[in-house]
Amino acid sequence: MSNKDQEIKEEAPVAIEDLSNPVVVDSYNAAGIIANNAIKHVISKCVVGALVVDICQYGDDFIEAEAAKTFTKRKNLEKGIAFPTCVSVNNCVGHFSPLKGNTRTLKQGDVVKIDLGCHIDGYIAVGAHTIIIGNTSAESMTGKVADAICAAHYALEAALRMIRPGKTSNEVTQVIEKISDMYGVTSVSGILSHELKRFIIDGEKVIFSKNEPSQKIQTYEFQENEVYCIDIVMSTGEGKAREEADRPTIYRRNLDSTYKLKSKASRDFKDQIVKRYSALPFPLRNFDEKVSKLGLVELVEHQVLAAYPVLFDRSGCEVVQFKTTVLVLPNGNHKLIGTEFPLPFVRSEFSVTDDAIKALIASPLKINKKAAKKASATTIDVKMQ
């Protein structure tokens, strides 16, 4: 692309906010590159003895710095963190992004989930990856953690290929469940994969990781030009996420709230949130501690802000996570995050045994139109019960 072409794209107004607009696709791709690189750099900081809070701050700073370098000719363009850097260890399911002064460090053998996101003009790319601290042995790791890593990886790859026009959200859920059963691990309850829209990180269309009797599940058919965050979280334990002693440190604005704040401190804090993060999630750590403490209580009490609770499975189990953002394009799906991350060096005694799911995982994300015309009768079809 020439500099002139780049200038035209940077200055082009965005009227259509879906993938039929090339400017929107460019924004998603730019956000994906930054988020992808952020995870790679955060992985390099995850060593024995490293402070988790320092790693999280490094990830946030990296995203902000890289986003500031993009689309510089488009004035007043909002860009930066779409989801704060979280480093959730062992049985912590997610949302661990501690405040300054937290002393948690990484230890040899810790199962570490890195989760973060970037946006350009509200177009969001989020991703997560799991590593094992010190997993550099010449011999592959085996056992339940290895089983969970393999299950989560293959479930993500299968879901990536199923989110296509004509397929439904419930079909994806069933494939995720089948794969977790094959590896003898558990999808964590309450984990949802969401449709993404401009400045909306948790769209109305969702994909459940497992079907549960207590859930009211609405089935959606996927459409061309949609964008989804696929979030796969597997546990070696019972897969029931719960809150423990750690208080939430990540919040987002509740756009449905009409409450008029009474405290000046609360109003000032809200103004800072809107200016820096719009409607997207933010970490308390990135605000002055006095300002956030004074303003937070009223905002939370009256549901002006919604919290992301720090969640845990039971003690003694391990939780793994792989997450990416997928663009559902006419010529196939485009995976924004995670294409270059090496998996932990693990080996499972289990495998994907369903022939249709194996064929699905082995199939390309991009559609070969010539091959598709010749082989329309042999389209991969994962049978559901």
From Swiss-Prot:
User: What family name appears in the similarity comment?
Assistant: Belongs to the peptidase M24 family.
Q: Which organism is it from?
A: Dictyostelium discoideum
Matches recorded under InterPro entries: Creatinase/aminopeptidase-like, PA2G4, PA2G4/ARX1, Pept_M24, Pept_M24_MAP, WH-like_DNA-bd_sf, WH_DNA-bd_sf
Q: Where is the signal peptide?
A: none
Q: Name the CDD domains for this protein.
A: PA2G4-like
- The protein in question is named Proliferation-associated protein A
List, alphabetically, the GO terms of the cellular component aspect: phagocytic vesicle
User: Pfam families from the xrefs?
Assistant: Peptidase_M24
